[in-house]
Amino acid sequence: MLDIINRLLGRENAGSRDIARERLRLVLIHDRASVSPNFLNALKEELIRVIREYMEIDEESLIVDLENEENSVALVANIPIRGFKRAANE
């Protein structure tokens, strides 16, 4: 019951709010760049997987965006780096 009241008063937990905000952002990007939200999410997950092999990153703060300007689309990524991993052959 308290959960319902908190949601009605706009006090839903930050996790749900962040997830909803991310989903909305993906939908808006889809509209601007004609790319499905699933495609952009898969791209983001693949970037995280590859970068994680070389660096320690803050996945919570990672932002991947498509910017559409006139006749071009740019992939813009803001990836906070916590540290670098040592190469296996060093």
Swiss-Prot record:
Q: Name one GO biological process term.
A: regulation of division septum assembly
Q: Which InterPro entries match?
A: MinE, MinE_sf
What does this chain do? Prevents the cell division inhibition by proteins MinC and MinD at internal division sites while permitting inhibition at polar sites. This ensures cell division at the proper site by restricting the formation of a division septum at the midpoint of the long axis of the cell.
Q: Does the keyword Hydrolase apply?
A: no
**Keyword annotations from UniProtKB, A to Z:** Cell cycle, Cell division
Origin species: Syntrophomonas wolfei subsp. wolfei (strain DSM 2245B / Goettingen)
* Family label: Belongs to the MinE family.
The record's listing under Pfam families reads: MinE
Q: What protein am I looking at?
A: Cell division topological specificity factor 2
User: From what superkingdom does this record's organism come?
Assistant: Bacteria
